[in-house]
């Protein structure tokens, strides 16, 4: 199959297994959930009644005071007491096979092509690290919410884009399923497309 280049009067021949496969929603969902789970810190920690540092003495005698029974100031129903089911640090990561991850990326790329959300260009750069220059370039292409994927991240382009809302710059090796589905359009250079194809072959 062929992808038409927007800034050149030619087409780029690409593999149908990478850019023309059916959309596997279940697989994409599983990989995206696993990716998001892997990004969680999982460092939250609370103290149970056994871990709270406090007196072990019974606050008042069992009978005769007219007050409710109390055996410990560490009780979860007391202020400053322990947490009943205290959260502990845990690893939230989920196992995703390489084949599944690549399959999800191929599904997303193919769906972007079908929805005309993937724009292939020969090159994409700015002369200086100026946000104004990038805004002008994006306006000319009628783009606002966009992920720019190049073979290697150009420093000028990265600096120009980092202060823009809903604009991100990645190299082909650094893209992930969440980034691809988070933007309205994806602009990709021809070399980045070829590099992606080799990675997912």
Swiss-Prot record:
Keyword Ribonucleoprotein among record annotations: yes
Pfam families, sorted: Ribosomal_L4
Coiled-coil regions listed in the entry: none
MF (Gene Ontology): rRNA binding; structural constituent of ribosome
GO cellular component terms, A-Z: ribonucleoprotein complex; ribosome
Keywords in alphabetical order: Ribonucleoprotein, Ribosomal protein, RNA-binding, rRNA-binding
Region (Disordered): 44-73
Ubl conjugation recorded as keyword: no
Any one Gene Ontology BP term: translation
Known partners and oligomeric status: Part of the 50S ribosomal subunit.
Protein name, entry field: Large ribosomal subunit protein uL4
Species assigned in the record: Hamiltonella defensa subsp. Acyrthosiphon pisum (strain 5AT)
Gene name of this polypeptide: rplD
């Amino acid at each position: 199959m062929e992808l038409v280049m927007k800034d050149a009067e030619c087409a780029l021949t690409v593999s149908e297994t990478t850019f023309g496969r059916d959309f596997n929603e279940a697989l994409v969902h599983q990989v995206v959930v696993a990716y998001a789970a892997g990004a969680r810190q999982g460092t939250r920690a609370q103290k149970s009644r056994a871990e709270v540092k406090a007196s072990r003495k019974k606050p008042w005698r069992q009978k005769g005071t007219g007050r409710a029974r109390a055996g410990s100031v560490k009780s979860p129903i007391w202020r400053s007491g322990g947490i009943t089911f205290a959260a502990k640090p845990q690893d939230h990561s989920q196992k995703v096979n390489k084949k599944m991850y690549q399959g999800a990326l191929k599904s997303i790329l193919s769906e972007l092509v079908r929805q005309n959300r993937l724009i292939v260009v020969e090159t994409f750069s700015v002369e200086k690290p100026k946000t104004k220059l990038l805004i002008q370039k994006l306006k000319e292409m009628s783009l606002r919410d966009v992920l720019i994927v190049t073979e290697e991240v150009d420093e000028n382009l990265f600096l120009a884009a980092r202060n823009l809302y809903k604009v991100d710059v990645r190299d082909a090796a650094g893209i992930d399923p969440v980034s691809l589905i988070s933007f309205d359009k994806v602009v990709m250079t021809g070399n980045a497309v070829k590099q992606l194809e080799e990675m997912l072959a």
